């Protein structure tokens, strides 16, 4: 490419960098810096975060553990977790619905799991599913450190596609009053349809889906709005520490056969 052509594209490149500077910062923190630290330490970011929690958080205090994870993400390494703003929305909805049984798809570091567990009424049960066994091991430690036992919070390591069909037979889950989709948005539609096919959503069940605007779940949103089985609402938010990057939590109420 000649210098003249390169100079012709320079204003466009500068414009894109300015317009998407927040996305560029996010890319640097979640991909470049994270990959470098993974190689340097031999540990994943969730494992490094848990080491920080062990030395800074109060065992048996889920609120303090959540605050410690927020501090780690803001001041040390970006964790790509739900964060306090979305967390308040999630806790409020869990408290309002008072579900007897909750299913979470995508445990990650256990952050949203703690949010749900501390908002549940006595006697409720939470099943949380994490595809990656190494990440699940970290989340298990976080959950137990917070003081939640296996009777209240059960962590299942495995892909949601394989776990959902086995929930009734192997985990005694006959219905999920509230479901949180917090794994990969491209799997949201598949897993929602699996929940429908296996009759795990009772009439009036609440389905919450994170990250429906960024990175986005357009097919999932289109399906829930057009299939006639859900009432839909969108809670507009943003990414933790990146207020300029808009995101949202979809709140669905199941009105189909249950």
Curated annotation (Swiss-Prot):
GO terms for biological process: auditory receptor cell development; catecholamine catabolic process; methylation; positive regulation of protein import; sensory perception of sound. Its EC number is 2.1.1.6. Changing residue 48 to L: In add; reduces methyltransferase activity; causes hyperkinesis, circling, head-tossing, aggression, progressive degeneration of the organ of Corti, hair cell defects and profound deafness. Disruption phenotype: Absence of auditory brain stem response (ABR) to click stimuli demonstrates that the mice are profoundly deaf. Normal hair bundle morphology as at postnatal day (P) 5 the sensory epithelia are patterned into three rows of outer hair cells (OHCs) and one row of inner hair cells (IHCs). The bundles of OHCs appear similar in size to those of wild-type mice and form a normal staircase pattern. Hair cells are maintained in the presence of gentamicin, an aminoglycoside antibiotic that enters hair cells through their transduction channels and normally causes hair cell death. It holds the Pfam family Methyltransf_3. GO terms for cellular component: apical part of cell; cytoplasm; endoplasmic reticulum. It is found in: Cytoplasm; Endoplasmic reticulum. The keyword Transferase applies. Changing residue 183 to A: Enhanced interaction with TMC1. GO terms for molecular function: catechol O-methyltransferase activity. Keywords: Catecholamine metabolism, Cytoplasm, Deafness, Endoplasmic reticulum, Hearing, Methyltransferase, Neurotransmitter degradation, S-adenosyl-L-methionine, Transferase. S-adenosyl-L-methionine binds at residues 104, 106-107, 112, 130, 160. Interacts with LHFPL5, PCDH15, TMC1, TMC2 and TMIE. The interaction of TOMT with TMC1 and TMC2 is required for the transportation of TMC1/2 into the stereocilia of hair cells. Interacts directly with TMC1. This is Transmembrane O-methyltransferase homolog. It comes from Mus musculus (Mouse).
